[in-house]
């Protein structure tokens, strides 16, 4: 099986990109594929589902991963002409417009996480990830992918050299009135 995470399933990423990736790769048509949308955690959820399937004995082999090319997703394309929430959800939250970014703001405020604290945590997280990568901690977890530009053998999402000072220069991602979380922190 193939389980793929993708939050913005529109345009090139629409329908069931997990299944289409199987076909585009030239794999046999009998290999199924599915796509998971759990917002920012889609790829992690795909991996979790794959691990659960193998651990439970339901599958022998599952390929898991994720895809998202935000530059190919038109801004606002996930919204239709209607509301993304039904009347019961809107009633429950007094017609308050919410999303994951606003949720991060609310959590930061509720638990007293300052912008500095969030930036410190982000910088430390990337520093630790880089050290773990350098020590080979992820080598048995990543299968090399061969591209025209050469093999990809490491997680390229780690931002080496990230500092609190650099992060403090980034604008808040979700509010314009002094919010805390930036894209790097969430």
Q: Over which residues does each language-model region extend?
A:
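Flexible glycine-/small-residue-enriched beta->alpha junction loops
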Residues: 51, 55-110
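Conserved catalytic cysteine-centered active-site region
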Residues: 4-60, 95-102, 168-186
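Short, well-ordered secondary-structure micro-motifs
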Residues: 13-15, 73-75, 154-156
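Glycine-rich nucleotide phosphate-binding loop and flanking beta-alpha elements
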Residues: 10, 69-71, 129
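Active-site-proximal alpha-helical scaffold in enzymes
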Residues: 37-67, 108-138
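N-terminal beta1-alpha1-beta2 module of alpha/beta enzyme domains
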Residues: 1
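Short glycine-/small-residue-rich flexible loop motifs, especially phosphate/cofactor-binding loops
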Residues: 19, 105, 130
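N-terminal extracellular/periplasmic Venus flytrap/periplasmic-binding protein-like
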Residues: 117-186
């Amino acid at each position: 099986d193939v389980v793929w995470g993708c939050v913005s399933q529109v345009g090139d990423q629409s329908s069931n990109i997990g299944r289409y990736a199987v076909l585009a790769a030239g794999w046999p048509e009998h290999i199924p594929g599915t796509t998971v949308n759990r917002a920012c955690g889609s790829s992690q959820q795909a991996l979790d589902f794959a691990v659960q399937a193998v651990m439970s004995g339901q599958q022998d082999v599952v390929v898991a991963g994720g895809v998202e090319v935000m530059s190919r997703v038109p801004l606002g394309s996930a919204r239709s002409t209607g509301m993304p929430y039904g009347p019961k959800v809107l009633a429950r939250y007094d017609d308050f417009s919410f999303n994951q970014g606003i949720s991060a703001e609310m959590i930061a405020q509720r638990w007293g996480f300052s912008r500095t604290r969030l930036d410190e945590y982000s910088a430390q997280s990337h520093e630790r990830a880089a050290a773990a990568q350098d020590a080979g901690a992820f080598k048995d977890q990543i299968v090399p992918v061969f591209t025209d530009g050469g093999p990809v053998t490491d997680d390229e999402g780690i931002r080496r050299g990230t500092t609190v000072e650099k992060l403090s220069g980034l604008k808040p991602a979700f509010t314009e009135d002094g919010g805390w979380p930036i894209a790097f922190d969430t």
